[in-house]
Amino acid sequence: MRLDHLTLHAPDLSAQRAFYALTLGLPVCHDTPEAFTVQVGRSRLSFRQGHTPAAHFAVDIPRTLVTQAQAWLEARAPLLADPAGQVRFGPDGAFHSSNLYFRDPAGHIAEFIARHDLPFDHAGPFGSQHALHLSEFGLVVPDVTGAVDWLEARLGLRAWVGRSPTFTPVGGADGSLIVVPRGRGWFPIGLPGQPVPFHLTYRQGQVERHLTPADLPFLRPQGLT
């Protein structure tokens, strides 16, 4: 599963645009008064005008540049800490990754993730060009088991790091939906996850697919678009 284009919402597009384009230095590839898009490596990230709960997404970075990425990001945005005050996590666990978290002006929880089992090796210094691609999107659902069963049966998206009623990634190391139940706290600050409107373009092999809450029967009662 390769995540090609994710669209979310932000209440203040000017602040959101300034953060991604000026603070983080990501190239703007589409810009209107109602929406804008930045290039994130091979992926695109768009924001439309709107008030929604906070979403979670992750961006892959090279495994060789984690320390440089931390210093670069700390100069531009506060890193999110767990209750013990830690701001850099891993590499450990099933993902064997190093992780840095921050929030954008809309409150979305963004993550830089370096996957140590993937050969993303780049020389520094770290810069916005080392944001390689979108690799995760948090899908908040009423029932994780039922949602994952549906995603596997209907879309062929498989759980790949175990299955749990509170946290199940589907897809693969190159791109995943992180399926969690409503109210589960997003790491590392414990912000309760809520369903959000989104539009995701992704690729399975050579097939391009589109996904919105309207395509997911387990989200339709949420009234998302």
Task: Spell out what each predicted region is.
Residues 84-89:
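A cross-kingdom feature marking solvent-exposed beta-strand/loop segments within repeated
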